[in-house]
Amino acid sequence: MRPVCLIAACLSAASGQTPAIPTAPITTFGVTVVDSVGLRGDIYLLRPNTDALPKFQKLKPVGAVYTSSLNIPPRSFLEGFPGVTDRYEWFAIDYHGTFWIDEPGKYRFLLASDDGSRLYIDDKVVINNDGIHAVQTETGTANLKTGSHRIRVSYFQGPRAGVALVLGVARPGEERWRIFNTKEFLPPHKPEN
């Protein structure tokens, strides 16, 4: 069963059900202003005709962007990354950060992208959506314990045309998808004495 992601919803081709992704502000790939509670995305330039995620450890980033969520529905992309590079095709972004789980259990994740992407939680692949393709959605699950967890979303864009990168989550017991936002997964605040 492979769900197909549309801008605000994900249609399950097999069941006909529509688990809606709540409307959230559409974001860019990020900004150059450091966000200490968000994701840092290192930007890499790729060779034309790259057809899969690169081995990032063999590349040197040209800059970084920061964001607390990945909500870039399918759209055209010609603006590049102001302040970093004007590249709008043949690039990759390797996002990484941490998030906090208060409620342990089975979390469902949704990753929609055009072109390839991969989601890692605590260095384990949860979703593999790699390759050159139009917008495509994959889902996966992770059993998470209370505490801090590492998250990584690797993404690449091949030839110019459209882009998309949406990361959704459903907490244990939730039916509806929501956009994953690091600001909703912060550690508890400890008051100072």
Please tell me what each predicted stretch does.
Residues 1-7:
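Sec-dependent signal peptide recognition
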Residues 8-16:
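Hydrophobic h-region of N-terminal signal peptides that target proteins for export
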Residues 3, 16-17:
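Short low-polarity hydrophobic stretches
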Residues 17-108, 112-193:
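Extracellular/secretory pathway-exposed regions associated with glycan biology
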